[in-house]
UniProtKB/Swiss-Prot annotation:
Family note: Belongs to the polypeptide deformylase family.
Cofactor info, note text: Binds 1 Fe(2+) ion.
Pfam families: Pep_deformylase
Enzyme Commission number, as recorded: 3.5.1.88
MF-aspect GO terms: metal ion binding; peptide deformylase activity
Organism: Chlorobium phaeobacteroides (strain BS1)
Gene name for this UniProt entry: def
Catalyzed chemical reaction(s): N-terminal N-formyl-L-methionyl-[peptide] + H2O = N-terminal L-methionyl-[peptide] + formate
UniProt enzyme class: hydrolase
Any one Gene Ontology BP term: translation
Keywords for this protein: Hydrolase, Iron, Metal-binding, Protein biosynthesis
Protein's recorded name: Peptide deformylase
Cofactor(s) the protein requires to work: Fe(2+)
Binding site for Fe cation: 94, 136, 140
SUPFAM superfamilies: Peptide deformylase (SSF56420)
Amino acid sequence: MILPINTYSDEVLRRKAKPLKESDAQLEELISNMLESMRNAEGIGLAAPQVGVSLRLIVVDLSLAEGYEAASPMVVINPHILSVKSFNSMEEGCLSIPDVRGDVVRPSAIQLKYRDRNFEECIGEFDRLAARVIQHEIDHLDGTLFVDRMQRRDRRKIQKELDALSRGEINTNYPVAFHEDSVVK
């Protein structure tokens, strides 16, 4: 089932998500729905808070990105970054902040501890686009949006677009959830 994606002004995007304690049929359904919703929106990453669920769960599928066509979808539960290497700046966007893009500095490689779709504990090394997408989605679990990480002068350049999103002026090809009473100031 395709879920609506919560937008910039929704308070669920500003909350720290709760860890998952176990896997069950509801979690499996949420994972499947998130993957379907992400693909429908032509995204490469999606965090549970973006679909209104405040849990530490992300899905990533880089197969839509050039050079990553063979990538398999990844489910990341309760992620924790163990280490980082070097930093670089790259333009990012977000399904919750449609049509807004900006440069963000992030580590270019990470070591990540997490649980997979089967709730098995994993430690993985990720670099380049995979590292960036995972960090972007982990930020969602911590109530941080990519625009919060932009340099102040760059953020000022997109403020009009953010204000428009806060007013509900949203044009996407995928379903969104807009909650007027949770506008971020």
